[in-house]
Amino acid sequence: MPRAAKSSRKKDPNTPKRNMSAFMFFSIENREKMKTDNPDATFGQLGSLLGKRWKELTSTEREPYEEKARQDKERYERERKEYDTKLANGEKTGKASAPAAAAAAKEE
């Protein structure tokens, strides 16, 4: 039975970027070294190797990444709250374009 087409809702480009997990911070920091150590590994294989290495880390070794994840979560929650407040107030969520800002400044 064919699926019904999902309605394509336009995503607001000004929506705050989601927070990253501790593992994502670890992956970003270690992917290049892992790629150098395993030059023939595919993207998926690198992901598996990174996951395996992540599981081997002690809680002490994970702490810097966990802290970055906590800070990023706080950033996301703060930005999301500001974004939602602007939406609720009917304000535009984007920044004014340079020509519009220049025109507004010129009128003053």
UniProtKB/Swiss-Prot annotation:
Disordered: region residues: 1-20, 61-108
According to the UniProt record, which residues make up the DNA-binding region?
16-84
The chain's coiled-coil residues are none
Bias type Low complexity, positions:
96-108
GO cellular component terms, semicolon-separated? chromatin; cytosol; nucleus
Q: Name one Pfam family in it.
A: HMG_box
GO biological processes: chromatin remodeling; DNA repair
Stated role: DNA-binding protein that induces severe bending of DNA. Required for DNA-binding by the FACT complex, a general chromatin factor that acts to reorganize nucleosomes. The FACT complex is involved in multiple processes that require DNA as a template such as mRNA elongation, DNA replication and DNA repair. Also augments the fidelity of transcription by RNA polymerase III independently of any role in the FACT complex.
Cite the PANTHER family for this sequence.
HIGH MOBILITY GROUP PROTEIN DSP1, MITOCHONDRIAL TRANSCRIPTION FACTOR A, ISOFORM B
Q: Which family does it belong to?
A: Belongs to the NHP6 family.
Q: Could you tell me what this protein is called?
A: Non-histone chromosomal protein 6
UniProt lists the gene as nhp6
